[in-house]
Amino acid sequence: QPLFQGLPANVGFVGADLTGKHKGLWGLNSLYSELKAMHFDYIADFHHVLRSKYLCLRFRLANKPVASICKGRAGKKKLVRRHDKVMENQKSSFRRYADVLEKLGLPVLLNFSSIYGEGKGNFAEIEPVTGPKEGQKWIGIAPFAKHRGKIYPLELQEQVIAHFAANPQVKVFLFGGGKNEQEVFDAWIAKYPSVVSMIGKLNMRTELNLMSHLDVMLSMDSANMHLASLVNIPVVSIWGATHPYAGFMGWKQLPVNTVQLDLSCRPCSVYGQKPCWRGDYACLRDIKPEQVIAKIEGIVG
């Protein structure tokens, strides 16, 4: 729910407990009953998966106008196939969401800037953890992603971290979570004491607050790219098995800030879960740390 903070008065949030009372078919029927009682005029399905399809079916049977997202699977399939790729920039997910609302006669202006409007989060709320900024350049680094095909090799990422950790005018914050990531962060912090791990120090809401005070975020094709985008921070994003053309670039992020290699085999996956058919993950391993450093320095100076 922290992602839905600062909603206008005419927007509400309803959570679905898919592991509890809304689990399974009976749970979905219960969720439908709860939603039906709210007397919606239109139903917009931005997800278009089995659960949401079932809810849409129930609403259609109740004569409610329903529109669902078109995910553009055909175009994405041509983009990632092994041979005869069609390298066409697919419609962004944001545009696809807006299209759903337009089908219902509700046109949308895509002019969002940040969950903090034109400002930033309350710095006093995070200063006890981060310390004062005092003219430093703050760089966030989110080195992990869900799938190997989206993770820049850690030994190469460490070279990027070492470069910026040596600069007293720069402070590096590491973003992640989980035991394995904590172990990697602990090893880096032992070598580079000026680097700070944020694991376990902030909740989602205050982590977004911190991101709003960064000068740049370095991220894989991962959730952190999108979180930083929500607070209007430039992101240097590294792309391996996946590609910005699939439509999943962060909100208002610039293509010039992407780091990727022009290989005939990529992209090979829409979401990055497929193993590398070459076996060497050259799309990531062949990216030089100097390329990443140059992109970051192009933003922070």
What are the functions of these language-model segments?
Residues 1-301:
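Catalytic machinery of carbohydrate-active enzymes
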